[in-house]
Amino acid sequence: MTADTEPVTIGALTRADAQRCAELEAQLFVGDDPWPPAAFNRELASPHNHYVGARSGGTLVGYAGISRLGRTPPFEYEVHTIGVDPAYQGRGIGRRLLRELLDFARGGVVYLEVRTDNDAALALYRSVGFQRVGLRRRYYRVSGADAYTMRRDSGDPS
């Protein structure tokens, strides 16, 4: 099978994936502050976080993570990251990863930040019920890019 026809599976992200996640971050967040492997290892070690990966032919081609906020219900959640290998973008992998995060957060309000110029991500988030609730100026420290804060209510069925 070729990369175009190899099935993509979604499953748990592990510490063994940290290096590949960092490699993808470096491709995806050029000019910003991509996470190194140690950051992924810290995220994966937290009991409040849930991370998933997308694999094609045994290669990690995408990742996503969310954190549960607070110690007692009702919980709120924050999407920490979603990334898909540029060679695999446009195939619905980001949507599948996001769906896994939203399933984990079922019943809770979910927040995220997204670059104001990331039209593809903004369209994806809107399509599953996220709404803009704020603007964070110079949120991305290295590039100085702005971010929207978005929120998806707990009752959103999408």
Swiss-Prot record:
Domain N-acetyltransferase: 8-155
Any Pfam family the entry gives: Acetyltransf_1
The protein's name in its UniProt record: N-alpha-acetyltransferase RimI
EC number: 2.3.1.255, 2.3.1.258
Family: Belongs to the acetyltransferase family. RimI subfamily.
Enzyme class: transferase
NCBIfam families xref list: rimI
Function per UniProt: N-alpha-acetyltransferase that specifically mediates the acetylation of N-terminal residues. Able to mediate acetylation of a wide variety of N-terminal residues, with preference for hydrophobic N-termini. Acetylates GroS/GroES and GroEL1. Able to acetylate the ribosomal protein bS18, but it is unclear whether it acetylates its N-terminal alanine residue.
CDD domains: NAT_SF
Molecular functions (GO terms): protein N-terminal-methionine acetyltransferase activity; protein N-terminal-serine acetyltransferase activity; protein-N-terminal amino-acid acetyltransferase activity; protein-N-terminal-alanine acetyltransferase activity
GO biological process: N-terminal protein amino acid acetylation
Complex formation: Monomer. Interacts with TsaD. Interacts with GroS/GroES.
Organism: Mycobacterium tuberculosis (strain ATCC 25618 / H37Rv)
Keywords: Acyltransferase, Transferase
Catalytic activity reported: N-terminal L-methionyl-L-alanyl-[protein] + acetyl-CoA = N-terminal N(alpha)-acetyl-L-methionyl-L-alanyl-[protein] + CoA + H(+); N-terminal L-methionyl-L-seryl-[protein] + acetyl-CoA = N-terminal N(alpha)-acetyl-L-methionyl-L-seryl-[protein] + CoA + H(+); N-terminal L-methionyl-L-valyl-[protein] + acetyl-CoA = N-terminal N(alpha)-acetyl-L-methionyl-L-valyl-[protein] + CoA + H(+); N-terminal L-methionyl-L-threonyl-[protein] + acetyl-CoA = N-terminal N(alpha)-acetyl-L-methionyl-L-threonyl-[protein] + CoA + H(+)
